[in-house]
Regions:
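N-terminal Rossmann-like NAD(P)+-binding domain of SDR-like oxidoreductases, especially those catalyzing
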Residues: 1-203, 344, 354
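Residue-level signal for the nucleotide or nucleotide-sugar donor/cofactor binding architecture
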Residues: 69, 98, 106-109, 166, ...
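Non-catalytic, hydrophobic alpha-helical segments
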Residues: 250, 254, 271, 281-284, ...
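Glycine/proline-rich active-site loop of Rossmann-fold NAD(P)-dependent oxidoreductases
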Residues: 180, 193-196, 205-221, 228-230, ...
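Amphipathic terminal alpha-helices
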Residues: 1-4, 330-355
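C-terminal "lid/loop" region of Rossmann-like NAD(P)-dependent oxidoreductases
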Residues: 237, 267-270, 282-285, 293-310, ...
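Hydrophobic "lid"/C-terminal helical patch
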Residues: 24, 254-258, 288, 334-341
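Conserved mid-core alpha-helix of short-chain dehydrogenase/reductase
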Residues: 73, 113-116, 244, 249-252, ...
């Protein structure tokens, strides 16, 4: 038995009680891998996620309550990891504008603390970081035109394939800056310290265990509001387009990245549903209305700083490198999430779109 209580080195998921983290933990545990969850348990619903995991996997995973901002506590917890998935973050653009110092400390300082803990362990622990499409900024150079209920890129290549990783980084809002700088630190630690790191720049992930109180869980927000008869506020005209990816496909990508970590060391990949799962907010709301059989109450407000009229991930790089592809269509995925929320929902706050 190891000093930390594990018979073998665990896969550590920082932020493992959250939406993506708990689904990733479930996948790893189902394959018999030891898992350590590190989380500050600050979000509503995370206790339900941990209880679900413990019930399903016989009181696993191991859980340590800790904050990424506390380097002294964090370092010994991750020092014996087989690998680290870093999913913990302050996720709201709105919060970053009001509390930029907290956003900086969690997203950038917290990521730095994890990288340093991995580096100082002397064990070349892989670190796979959950980044965001917000590192590309508002994409002012991507010209779009409005067609019916959606924005469409004028460029035929982007229209067919989406935004690829050669798109210039353009950090916007404190959230975009903190996540973008963290993204670059993770990549640089592969160059400067030979640490096996990789970055997944995520589009909109949705699915079971996503509770509607999460600022960026806008797909779940919309569904919860429809199911509860709450109004939905759209910022802008609702023609903004995003590619949405079911969490089961996201988990497969994270696991694929770990399996090929030495091959992809120091690289970043866009991760999303791609062009086949691209929807405007209006399209999604129409689908939700038909799915739930409810008339939605939709309010409109002015668009927000840094909001992208169009972001669809070009996933050809991750598909070619990892042999990964999105399997769950967006309509099937929405039905799956709606069914799950019917049985597990928390009462939502007034729903807001923050993509």
């Amino acid at each position: 038995m190891r000093p930390d209580g594990f018979r073998e080195a665990p896969v550590t998921i920082v932020g493992g009680s959250g939406f993506i983290g708990s689904n990733l933990a479930d996948s790893l545990l189902s394959d018999g891998m030891p898992v350590l969850v590190i989380d500050n348990l600050s979000r509503p619903g995370v206790e339900q996620n941990l209880a679900w995991l413990a019930q399903k996997h016989g009181n696993q995973p191991a859980v340590e309550t800790a904050d990424v901002r506390n380097a002294d506590v964090l370092a010994p917890l991750v020092a014996h990891s087989r690998a680290i998935f870093h999913l913990a973050a302050q996720t709201a653009v709105t919060t970053s504008l009001v509390q930029p110092s907290e956003d900086f400390d969690i997203n950038l300082r917290g990521t730095f603390n994890i990288l340093e803990a991995a580096r100082r362990s002397g064990k070349r622990i892989p670190v796979i970081f959950a980044s965001t499409n917000k590192v590309y900024g508002g994409l002012p150079d991507v010209a779009v035109r409005e067609e019916d209920d959606r924005c469409v890129p004028c460029d035929a290549g982007i229209r067919a394939n989406g935004i690829d990783e050669t798109c210039g980084l353009d950090f916007c809002t404190p959230y975009g800056c903190s996540k973008g700088a963290a993204d670059q630190y993770v990549l640089d630690y592969a160059k400067s310290y030979d640490l096996p790191t990789a970055v997944l720049r995520m589009s909109c992930i949705y699915g079971p265990r996503q509770f509607g109180t999460e600022d960026q869980g806008w797909v779940a927000h919309f569904l919860l509001s429809a199911l509860s008869g709450q109004p939905i506020t759209i910022y802008g005209n609702g023609k903004q387009v995003r590619d949405i990816l079911h969490v089961s496909d996201a988990v497969a990508a994270y696991r694929g990245a770990l399996a090929r970590i030495e091959d992809i060391r120091g690289k970043a990949f866009n991760l999303g549903g791609g062009p086949n799962n691209a929807v405007s907010l209006r399209m999604l709301l129409k689908e939700i209305g038909e799915l739930t059989g409810r008339k939605l109450s939709i309010l409109y407000d002015r668009e927000r700083t840094g909001d992208q009229p169009f972001f669809v991930a070009d996933t050809r790089k991750i598909e070619a490198t990892l042999g990964w592809k999105a399997h769950v269509s967006w309509r099937d995925g929405i039905r799956d999430l709606a069914d799950w929320l019917q049985h597990h929902r928390l009462e939502p706050e007034a729903a807001r779109y923050v993509a």
